Amino acid sequence: IEAASGIVVCSHGNARAVVPSDRNFPDEVLKAVAQKGGVCGVAGWPPFISTNNRPSMDDMIRMIDYMVDLVGIDHVGIGMDYMHGQAGTVSNEDAEALYEYLVDSGNWSEETYPAPPWYYPEGIELPSTFFNLTGALLVRGYKKEDVAKIWGGNWLRIMGEVWG
């Protein structure tokens, strides 16, 4: 991050202080991304958002809250990471086959990536229910302008700055 001459992003970068996964980032990394003007995208992939196999909407909001408090509203976005293999989209057998392939190929480790089923946070389990995050953020007390930043406004700002 220090060597970068411009904006840096963590497209799927949750806080390790909230969920101690090797894939989540320490606070100092998230702060460094923000100091470069970047955005950290909160991922909803179950093991990165909660230690519970069935995360709740509150788990997702708690991660967003922590990151907004840490780096500021202008540096938090969504990097949901919906994927083939998640519960509700394929059979358990297909999810297991995908997992075995990813582990056997060396792309994933069993220590960092638990075996399926992978249940996304309650209320936003599938892309078709993802809109429910808006209401949850508003109920939590976020202003409409801030929800718009989290949903994509911060990513659009970066695209404009990087690509003009």
PLM feature spans:
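Histidine/acidic residue-rich metal-binding segments in metalloenzymes
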Residues: 1-9, 22-38, 58-74
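Active-site-proximal loop/turn and secondary-structure-junction residues that shape catalytic pockets
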Residues: 4, 14-15, 44-48, 82-84
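Sec-exported extracytoplasmic/periplasmic mature domains
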Residues: 5, 34-35, 65, 69-72, ...
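Conserved, mostly hydrophobic/aromatic
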Residues: 12, 40, 81, 147
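Active-site glycine- and acidic-residue-rich loops that bind
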Residues: 14-24, 49-62
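A conserved active-site cap/scaffold subdomain adjacent to cofactor or substrate pockets
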Residues: 34-57
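Short acidic/histidine-rich active-site segments
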Residues: 44, 71-96, 100-123
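Mid-to-C-terminal alpha-helical segments outside catalytic/metal-binding sites
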Residues: 113-164
